Amino acid sequence: MRVMGIDCGSEYTGFGIVESDDRARLHCIVAGAVHLSARDPLENKLAKIFRELCSVIREHDPEVVAIEDVFYAVNAKSALKLGHVRGVAMLAVAECGLRVATYAPLAVKSAVVGYGKAEKCQVQAMVARLLNLPQVPEPADVADALAIAICHLHTSATLTRMHAKA
């Protein structure tokens, strides 16, 4: 299964595509980030995210896309901007004819590290280890996107095993 993870951010929107082979080994197909200039108007940032995510999806052909659930932010303005980014990311996925799976941040950390309250650096280190990468992906949004994809792969594999036993 090939899964794309997206980590929505107002400075960088990270993406990563992870594939699980028939032995349940994970492979990073591509990872990167859409860099957003602080000087650009919001509508230009959103258009750039849309174009670049559509391009990655079309080029690498994931089966499903996973995105983190909305979390509560202290600053309402920041939360609203992230909501815009998340909406555009979901629109790009829908435009490419794929479905979106969403996961709570706690679920992503649990699936990758085994502990829902893991520190960001622990998640990043485990992503590098699980994908056999020479170093932790940068910026952090890229590692987060890969973690979201890994979460979906682990979750769907568990559900498949449960249904097979039923």
Curated annotation (Swiss-Prot):
One of its GO terms (cellular component) is Holliday junction resolvase complex. Belongs to the RuvC family. This is Crossover junction endodeoxyribonuclease RuvC. NCBIfam families: PRK00039.2-1 (NF000711), ruvC (TIGR00228). Disulfide bonds: none annotated. The RuvA-RuvB-RuvC complex processes Holliday junction (HJ) DNA during genetic recombination and DNA repair. Endonuclease that resolves HJ intermediates. Cleaves cruciform DNA by making single-stranded nicks across the HJ at symmetrical positions within the homologous arms, yielding a 5'-phosphate and a 3'-hydroxyl group; requires a central core of homology in the junction. The consensus cleavage sequence is 5'-(A/T)TT(C/G)-3'. Cleavage occurs on the 3'-side of the TT dinucleotide at the point of strand exchange. One of its GO terms (biological process) is DNA recombination. Pfam families: RuvC. It catalyses: Endonucleolytic cleavage at a junction such as a reciprocal single-stranded crossover between two homologous DNA duplexes (Holliday junction). GO terms for molecular function: crossover junction DNA endonuclease activity; DNA binding; magnesium ion binding. Homodimer which binds Holliday junction (HJ) DNA. The HJ becomes 2-fold symmetrical on binding to RuvC with unstacked arms; it has a different conformation from HJ DNA in complex with RuvA. In the full resolvosome a probable DNA-RuvA(4)-RuvB(12)-RuvC(2) complex forms which resolves the HJ. Mg(2+) 1 binds at residues 7, 141. It comes from Koribacter versatilis (strain Ellin345). Mg(2+) 2 binds at residue 68. It is an enzyme of class 3 (hydrolase). The active site is at residues 7, 68, 141. Binds 2 Mg(2+) ion per subunit. Keywords: Cytoplasm, DNA damage, DNA recombination, DNA repair, DNA-binding, Endonuclease, Hydrolase, Magnesium, Metal-binding, Nuclease. Its main location: cytoplasm. InterPro entries: RNaseH-like_sf, RNaseH_sf, X-over_junc_endoDNase_Mg_BS, X-over_junc_endoDNase_RuvC.
